[in-house]
Amino acid sequence: MNLTPDQALKEIRQKKIQPLYFIHGDEPYYIDILADALEKVVVPESEKGFNQFVLFGKDADVGTILNNARRFPFMAERQLILVKEAQQSSGLDSKEKTVMLEDYAARPLPSTVLVLCFQGNFDMRKSLPKVFEKNGVLIQCKKMYDNKLPDWVGEYARSLGAKISIKAIQMLVENIGNDLKRITSEIDKILLNLTASEEITAGVVEKYVGISKEYNVFELQKALTQRDVLKANKIAIYLAANPKDNPLPQVLIILYNFFSKVLVIHGTQDKSEGNLASVLGVSPFFVKDYLSAA
């Protein structure tokens, strides 16, 4: 079967385990999350010592993977063979070795859960992922589109029982981009410093994510839209004097992304929030910011 990362996570957490998992894609966050979930669920804690094996591609060729997969679990219902960075496994470029792996996947051992994690997109024209899909689960972890990020960040915070403001979401997304690992790491770090009832606000993000409260690219953006020349120049001078904390390429990307969308608004006849969100490819949360600058 072919599942999205979220669908697969749901099934794993419900302990609906399949004998084969083929995980690939250019979003390492989901690849790692899926691997961690399988490590937690497949083999009980008391049986992990003898029945859970984590291999790394550079140290495990196809023969090693198959030898482990064909073993029977030790006094247990099943074993987990998890191969991380499987793209580095020697033998995958050999037709003979690949056929051996395909033969196993065509008739997998019911007591073995074999998981191959590939960093990067696998060539789907090849037959190996198709065999895994037929008898197990195929999961592609795609990079998240920018317009999906705000909702995803908000949902992640809420999944941890936290409240987060729209402005805080915007600051995280625009400062970090679609690096899901870093976004989740920063939110986790923030929550360690807050009580359960405290909201993640823009001020909290400024404090704990290392963004200067008065002199950052977001304040520069705001000063420019308000045509506050004095403040804009002060911030620009500060950013230029601190290039390590404010790399010029990052500053330019954030400003370009914002003002290019403002320019699009000027050329759009239907300026309803719903239409602009679709045209700009952003969450409706942020349309007002662009409208106010237009």
Q: Which residue stretches match the model-derived regions?
A:
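Conserved beta/loop motifs at nucleotide-recognition and modification sites
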Residues: 1-294
